[in-house]
């Protein structure tokens, strides 16, 4: 499995069966095998997680087979093969992969894909969005909602390890920036974890690793 960081929450994952392009906003794509299928996944319609121009970009790159998996808050583009998804469901994909969706604490879904025995997780905007300016009741409910979804992921895994996970680490949350990441790492087993949604502040990953040295071996920098 090969992982390429694109921009913000956008990643390209190559497996033996296909490419997965998660939450593309903008950025350059690497050279790809045009005979291989690519699945474009967008967790929700926020501008930093979905850009409809991706489909014309892939066409200009010569990609021959393009599929799309879009959250149900996104207007479906004029494509021949689109799967529109909602939270809390399971789907069988075109090349015998399976997809489980989890409910975001903001909008849309998080993705858990199984592809020939390998597991890929992309959080979208599923995070413990605690803010200092919000009320205690808001933040308490947010944490409750987030932990419920992470616990559902752990239950779904039933002791298995995620091979590659993409998890929010947002510096705008200030002292609460690591709440979501820490709970995920404590309750979900993953081999490699890529922080995302950092708004260009890659230094926040160094801050996290300095404060949580126990995760040095599994946290991957862009």
Where in the sequence are the language-model features?
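Binuclear metal-ion centers of metallo-dependent hydrolases, dominated by the metallo-beta-lactamase
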Residues: 1-8, 77-91, 177-222
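Short amphipathic alpha-helical segments
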Residues: 33-34, 52-55, 80, 134-135, ...
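Structural motif
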Residues: 21-22, 41, 120-123, 166, ...
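Glycine-rich, phosphate-binding/catalytic loops in enzymes
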Residues: 38-40, 56-60, 138-141, 182-185, ...
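Active-site environment of divalent metal-dependent phosphoester hydrolases
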Residues: 27-29, 46-50, 73-77, 90-92, ...
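Core dinuclear metal-dependent hydrolase active-site scaffold
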Residues: 1-35, 81-161
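A short, acidic, amphipathic alpha-helical segment used as a generic capping/interface helix at domain edges
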Residues: 149-157, 174-183
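Active-site metal-binding motif and surrounding structural segment of the metallo-beta-lactamase
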Residues: 26-73, 155-166
